[in-house]
């Protein structure tokens, strides 16, 4: 049986809003088909474009330096935390906004990508997506960090309550060296376990956050 892939990333396009107040992506055509066709004397043609985007665009990974000065940057993230990581998916759709440690009670998440399903991604690219987001509590993040999770992902605007300026989830998880993947989608298509997550950003030295093509291989 051929492998099955589940797409977990939102497509990126010019002008889309990921997080209210941050710059939207801009696309510039550098070489178009007509220009290149002339350059190659009608024998071939190409499209070359540039994408100017904030690191917090679409579905992206946070590295520790995003929250902590002197923390590990994107280039320093170990690939074993980002590629072919066994998944452990938790259904938090009945929790309301605050997702506490009881969701993870008794679960073995050591060395796993903890993926929290809220179904908030159904509001993607609507005004509703920019407020009242589901989030992980500080106690929940303490549990995950202590249990040895390798990555934590969520299909929400933010893993923190955007009204909490302390940002405990980012503080705890990134402080423990655990990458965060936000703005995921299609989590309802995932089994509770048995798949492997791939969510690898570019090795940007000094980079804090960057979009990823996140997917699970079943």
Model-derived segments and spans:
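Active-/binding-site microenvironments in catalytic and ligand-binding cores
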Residues: 1-218
């Amino acid at each position: 049986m051929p492998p099955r892939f589940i797409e977990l990333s939102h497509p990126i396009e010019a002008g889309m809003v990921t997080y209210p107040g941050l710059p939207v992506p801009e696309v510039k055509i550098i070489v178009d088909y007509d220009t290149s066709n002339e350059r190659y004397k009608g024998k071939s043609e190409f499209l070359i474009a540039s994408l100017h985007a904030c690191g917090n665009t679409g579905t992206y990974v946070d590295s520790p330096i995003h929250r902590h000065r002197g923390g590990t940057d994107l280039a320093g993230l170990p690939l074993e935390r980002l590629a072919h990581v066994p998944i452990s998916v938790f259904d938090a759709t009945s929790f309301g906004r605050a997702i506490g440690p009881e969701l993870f009670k008794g679960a073995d998440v050591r060395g796993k990508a903890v993926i929290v399903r809220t179904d908030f991604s159904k509001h993607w690219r609507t005004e509703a997506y920019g407020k009242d987001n589901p989030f992980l509590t500080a106690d929940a993040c303490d549990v995950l960090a202590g249990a040895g999770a390798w990555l934590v992902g969520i299909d929400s605007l933010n893993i923190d309550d955007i009204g909490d300026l302390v940002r405990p989830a980012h503080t705890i998880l990134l402080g423990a060296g655990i990458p965060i993947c936000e703005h995921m989608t299609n989590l309802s298509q995932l089994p509770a376990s048995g798949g492997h997550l791939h969510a690898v950003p570019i090795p940007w030295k000094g980079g804090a956050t960057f979009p990823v093509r996140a997917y699970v291989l079943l």
